[in-house]
Amino acid sequence: MARIEARELDLTEKVVSVNRVAKVVKGGRRFSFAALVVVGDGKGHVGAGLGKASEVPEAIRKGIEDAKKNLIKVPMVGTTIPHEIIGHFGAGKVLLKPAAPGTGVIAGGPVRAVLEAAGIRDILTKSLGSANPNNAVYATIEGLKGLKRAEEVARLRGKTVAELIG
């Protein structure tokens, strides 16, 4: 799969979570920050990244950089997804279900950020397993990676779409 060039897309950034983490050393605690960032163009491209630094703005900048390196293309049918799928990452599981036009994005915080960045307007989701924002975001991305259009599946199986649905 060819890498998606972030420079050619008009990306919007959304900070999903900023976490203060501590390293315990002899003299006490050393604090640093981890920022989870989602980027997307609202037209089917989305990526997520984690940035770590001693200052929040620097962690966010690194997260954006990382997210731009991990862009994926989401196959869409109108304003929703082609079929139901469960994305897994660590202990996080996210169920993604296509929805009728006008339904809107029915999703929790971290999952919603990914779907809105991707440009999906109508979808039903349920976060199963881990409620950790990192796992929820990456499980959503894994689910979106696993989506295939009916035409693509038919081509892979050497059949027509009518035979596949039929």
Curated annotation (Swiss-Prot):
InterPro entries in alphabetical order: Ribosomal_Su5_D2-typ_SF (IPR020568), Ribosomal_uS5 (IPR000851), Ribosomal_uS5_bac-type (IPR005712), Ribosomal_uS5_C (IPR005324), Ribosomal_uS5_N (IPR013810), Ribosomal_uS5_N_CS (IPR018192), Ribsml_uS5_D2-typ_fold_subgr (IPR014721)
GO CC annotation terms, alphabetical: small ribosomal subunit
Domain S5 DRBM span(s) in chain numbering: 11-74
GO biological process: translation
Cystine pairs: none
Family matches, as PROSITE patterns: RIBOSOMAL_S5, S5_DSRBD
One Gene Ontology term of the molecular function aspect: structural constituent of ribosome
UniProt keyword list: Ribonucleoprotein, Ribosomal protein, RNA-binding, rRNA-binding
Pfam short name (any one): Ribosomal_S5_C
Its job: With S4 and S12 plays an important role in translational accuracy.
NCBIfam families given in the database record: rpsE_bact (TIGR01021)
Comment, domains: The N-terminal domain interacts with the head of the 30S subunit; the C-terminal domain interacts with the body and contacts protein S4. The interaction surface between S4 and S5 is involved in control of translational fidelity.
Family named by the database record: Belongs to the universal ribosomal protein uS5 family.
Description of how the protein assembles with itself and partners: Part of the 30S ribosomal subunit. Contacts proteins S4 and S8.
Designated name of the protein: Small ribosomal subunit protein uS5
Gene: rpsE
